[in-house]
Amino acid sequence: DLCWRKQYVGIMELEYEGVKIYFIDNEYYFGGEKPYSDARYDLEKFAFFSRAVLSALPVIDFRPDVIHCHDWHTGLIPVYLKDSFASGEFYQGIKTIMTIHNLKFQGVWDIDTIKDIAGLSDYYFTSDKLKDYDNGNYLKGGIVYADMVTTVSDTYAEEIKTPFFGEGLDGLLRARSNCLRGIVNGIDYDEYNPATDKYIDKNFSKTNFRKEKVKNKTALQKELGLEVNPKKMMIGIVSRLTDQKGFDLISCVMDEMCQDAVQFVILGTGEERYENMFRHFDWKYGKSVSANIYYSEERSHKVYAACDAFLM
């Protein structure tokens, strides 16, 4: 039940390595070629997803202690838990965590449209809730109503409380300081175990890495057309190419670094200016810079195994 319209919710189940994973199915919202499309359509899509997630829980007979929400796309889940789902006994006591990966994207549209899409009353559109100037803001709603708010590092948690990095929400984040934490992104030590990783060219462990690890570097240098030189320092970047990552800080020193015995391997997509920046340095320093403007799970393993340093 999505405000004035009803939409089908399918539930698909997959068990992977002993963990049950549930998928929300709806051809109207999720049948396209890409996960994101028109901004207004995406707002409706993720309002549907948020309601569907909460509606599905009693159907699959799973009552979580905590629902972990990520970015604006799920910002309405903490709001709905305090609104249309608040009276249901099943939902009593469920806590929510709102994780901010990128504060720049907030799910903002005019208030009348968001009221219509989300089915929320005027009560929720005041400056201390979802109202953001004259608009409604999904992420702001998630930050206001979640029990805890996290970001991807302690540093970012502090930065977003300042006007420069706060994207207009710094005041709210300062107000929620006691509930705001930074948690550094982790890695799966089994999947990214160099002793057993099936994607890398030469497996190694802590007992032989000084001898064997460098073979991954020379193999990747050959594969990417870089100068094959085990003594070159290789810096790996596997990332979204956005402002928040600080790539503007290295743009002014790339020329100087590429004159030294340094190589860069970039893997990822993002803002056009950073994609083009790394393409430019690839063109200019083809034996020292490899710009791979896409994402590949296999190649990410190779970069992690080969590089001497990793730039985040």
Which functions belong to the PLM regions below?
Residues 1-312:
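Catalytic cores of nucleotide-sugar-dependent glycosyltransferases that transfer UDP/GDP/TDP-activated
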